[in-house]
């Protein structure tokens, strides 16, 4: 039931927020690496799809990128976007505001380190030169597309992304 799902989410969030910061940081590294690997999958599908219809290309890209969130959930890693669900435990009075914010900061930094690690492995492994350099050009084109959003557009797209991750995590705990 929704009430049981909320109780479960509160307890999981309270557990995450009360974990030792080092464990949250390591879990954050794992999640950051998973999302970075998903971006590798996404980039590969987008690089190889020049002649495919736009909608099909985006569907395949979205499906393979979703593997990142699936890996995070299966591994029990901490992704910043899902860690913001600790707000449920804060509202329920199970954790303090300090515990919640500390968790957010530690997990965010862990995600950054995990993503940076995969980026370094990709760079030093020469993956950017795959498909005669087209793989690396796809990364650059994706980045260029992202920086052309206004601040307001980027903020709202971030909210939409966070909602989608929340729903995915919530659904995984409701089964």
Question: Can you say where each PLM-predicted feature lies in the sequence?
Answer:
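Alpha-helical transmembrane segments and their helix-helix packing motifs
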Residues: 1-175
């Amino acid at each position: 039931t929704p009430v049981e799902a909320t109780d479960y989410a509160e307890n999981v969030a309270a557990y995450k927020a009360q974990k030792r910061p080092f464990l949250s940081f390591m879990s954050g590294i794992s999640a950051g690496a998973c999302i970075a690997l998903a971006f590798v999958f996404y980039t590969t599908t987008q690089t190889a799809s020049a002649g495919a219809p736009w909608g099909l290309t985006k569907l395949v890209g979205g499906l393979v990128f979703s593997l990142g969130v699936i890996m995070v959930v299966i591994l029990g890693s901490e992704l910043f976007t899902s860690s913001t669900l600790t707000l449920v435990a804060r509202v329920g009075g199970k954790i303090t505001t300090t515990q919640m914010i500390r968790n957010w900061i530690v997990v965010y930094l862990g995600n950054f380190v995990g993503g940076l690690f995969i980026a370094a492995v990709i760079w030093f492994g020469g993956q950017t030169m795959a498909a005669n350099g087209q793989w690396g050009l796809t990364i650059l084109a994706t980045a260029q597309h992202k920086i052309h959003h206004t601040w307001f557009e980027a903020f709202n797209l971030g909210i939409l992304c966070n909602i989608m991750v929340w729903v995915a995590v919530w659904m995984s705990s409701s089964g």
